[in-house]
From Swiss-Prot:
It comes from Campylobacter jejuni subsp. jejuni serotype O:2 (strain ATCC 700819 / NCTC 11168). Its EC number is 6.3.4.5. PROSITE patterns: ARGININOSUCCIN_SYN_1 (PS00564), ARGININOSUCCIN_SYN_2 (PS00565). Signal peptide: none annotated. Homotetramer. Its main location: cytoplasm. This is Argininosuccinate synthase.
C-alpha cells in the first residue's frame, strides 16, 4: 500500500505522538501530508499545532484547523443526552461521542483535498481505532487507512523519543503537563495510564484537572434552573446561549461544586478491561435534569421503553457505530419521544451532588395532582382498583386452582 498513497490526511493534535506520526508518514510512505486539527473544546491553544506542522514541512494550504464546538454539542452531545445514554451504568461516553465528528470531518477534508488516505494516532489496543475507522469508511469507503501503531516498531516510549530526537522533533515537556494519558473535549476529560493501570490504586488528587474536590467545594449550595425544548437544553437561569456556550456554563458550575468525577473499570470493545478516570461536570448535571423533565412529560410505557433501549444505544456509541442504520433508527424513536420534553428543572448543586428540587412544564406535563392526591378524591374512584387487580391476578388465580404453588 505504501507506493499507492500519494496524499494522506492526518488527525493531528500538535503533540509529540502525532508529530512523530507526521514525520513517519513522510518517511515511510513518501507522501504529501495534510494535517487536520479539530477544536471540540479541549481547552488548548490550537495555533501551536499550526506552527508545529509548518516546522515539520507541511504546506500552509495543507493545514486545516476547524472549530467544531457548536456542531459537536448540537449534533452529537445533545442527541445522545436525549437518550440518557450511559455505558455500563456509569460512563457518559465523553470520548466515544467525539470520534464520529472528527472522523467525518477528516474524511470530508480528504475528499476536498484529493487525498487517497487518512491516518490517526489511536493504538491497536483501544476503542478509538474502531471508532475512527468506522467513521472514515462510512463516509468514504475507498479511502486507505494508515494506523501507525499497528504498523511501526516504535512500540515503547524510549523508541518514540529516540525517533523524535533523530528527526529534530521537539520533545520538551510543557510546564504543568500531566503525566497521564488524557483526552479532553467540551463534554469531559479522561485519564489513563501510570498508577491507574492498577485498579486497586486510588488516583492522586492532583490528577483531576478540572473540578474542585467535593471536600473543597463551596459550603453553600447553589440553585440553578435549566430550560429544555424538545429534550435539548436551551437556557441556564433564563440565559439563552449557543449549544457550546450552554455546556461550557454547565461545566463551570459543575467544576465549582465538585460534580462529575468518575473512576471505573470498563469493558473495551476489543475485549479487554480498562480502568479510566473521568470528569464530566456539565454532562452529569444535564443528565439529571433531563431525566427529571422526562418524569413529568413522558408517558409511562414510552419512558420504560426508552430505558430498555438505552443500553443498546449507549453500546453502539461506545463501540463506534454512530453512523450505523441501527443507531439512526433508535435516534428517530428517541427524538419522537422528545416532542413533549419541554419545561424547566430546578437543581441544587452541593459538594459533588446534583439534587432535583423542582420540575415543571406549562403545556406538556402529565402530572395531575387531582389523580394522585392524598386528600379527598374528586376525579379518581378508588373502587375501580379492585377490578384492575383481579384481572391482573387472573393467571395466578387459575394456576392456583390448578394446584400450582408459587
Amino acid at each position: 500500500m505504501k507506493n499507492e498513497v500519494k496524499k494522506v490526511v492526518l488527525a493531528y493534535s500538535g503533540g509529540l505522538d502525532t508529530s512523530i506520526i507526521l514525520k513517519w508518514l513522510q518517511d515511510e510512505y513518501n507522501c504529501e501530508v495534510v494535517t487536520f486539527t479539530a477544536d471540540i473544546g479541549q481547552g488548548e491553544e490550537l495555533e501551536p499545532a499550526r506552527k508545529k506542522a509548518l516546522s515539520l514541512g507541511i504546506k500552509e494550504e495543507n493545514i486545516f484547523i476547524k472549530d467544531l464546538r457548536d456542531e459537536f454539542v448540537k449534533d452529537y452531545v445533545f442527541p445522545m443526552f436525549r437518550a440518557n445514554a450511559i455505558y455500563e451504568g456509569e460512563y457518559l461516553l465523553g470520548t466515544s461521542i467525539a470520534r464520529p465528528l472528527i472522523a467525518k470531518t477528516q474524511a470530508q477534508i480528504a475528499l476536498q483535498t484529493g487525498a487517497d488516505a487518512v491516518s490517526h494516532g489511536a493504538t491497536g489496543k483501544g476503542n478509538d481505532q474502531v471508532r475512527f475507522e468506522l467513521g472514515y469508511l462510512a463516509f468514504s469507503p475507498d479511502l486507505k487507512i494508515i494506523a501507525p501503531w499497528r504498523e511501526w516498531d516504535l512500540n515503547s516510549r524510549e523508541k518514540l523519543l529516540a525517533y523524535a530526537q533523530k528527526h529534530g522533533i521537539d520533545i520538551s515537556k510543557k510546564k504543568g503537563k500531566s503525566p497521564y494519558s488524557m483526552d479532553a473535549n467540551l463534554l469531559h476529560i479522561s485519564y489513563e495510564g501510570l498508577v491507574l493501570e492498577d485498579p486497586a490504586h486510588a488516583p492522586e488528587e492532583d490528577m483531576w484537572r478540572w473540578s474542585k474536590s467535593p471536600k473543597d467545594a463551596p459550603n453553600e449550595s447553589e440553585i440553578i434552573e435549566l430550560d429544555f425544548q424538545k429534550g435539548d437544553l436551551v437556557a441556564i437561569n433564563g440565559e439563552k446561549l449557543s449549544p457550546a456556550g450552554l455546556l461550557t456554563k454547565l461545566n463551570e458550575l459543575g467544576c465549582k461544586h465538585g460534580i462529575g468525577r468518575l473512576d471505573i473499570v470498563e469493558n473495551r470493545y476489543v475485549g479487554m478491561k480498562s480502568r479510566g478516570c473521568y470528569e464530566t461536570p456539565g454532562g452529569t448535571i444535564l443528565l439529571k435534569a433531563h431525566r427529571a423533565l422526562e418524569s413529568i412529560t413522558l408517558d409511562r410505557e414510552a419512558a420504560h421503553l426508552k430505558d430498555e433501549l438505552m443500553p443498546k444505544y449507549a453500546s453502539l456509541i461506545y463501540n463506534g457505530y454512530w453512523f450505523s442504520p441501527e443507531r439512526m433508527m433508535l435516534q428517530a424513536l428517541i427524538d419522537e419521544s422528545q416532542i413533549h420534553a419541554n419545561g424547566r428543572v430546578k437543581l441544587e448543586l452541593y459538594k459533588g451532588n446534583v439534587m432535583v428540587i423542582g420540575r415543571e412544564s406549562a403545556n406538556d406535563s402529565l402530572f395531575n395532582a387531582a389523580y394522585c392526591t392524598f386528600e379527598e378524591d374528586e376525579v379518581y374512584n378508588q373502587k375501580d382498583a379492585a377490578g384492575f387487580i383481579k384481572l391482573n391476578a387472573l393467571r395466578f388465580i387459575i394456576a392456583g386452582k390448578n394446584g400450582r404453588k408459587f
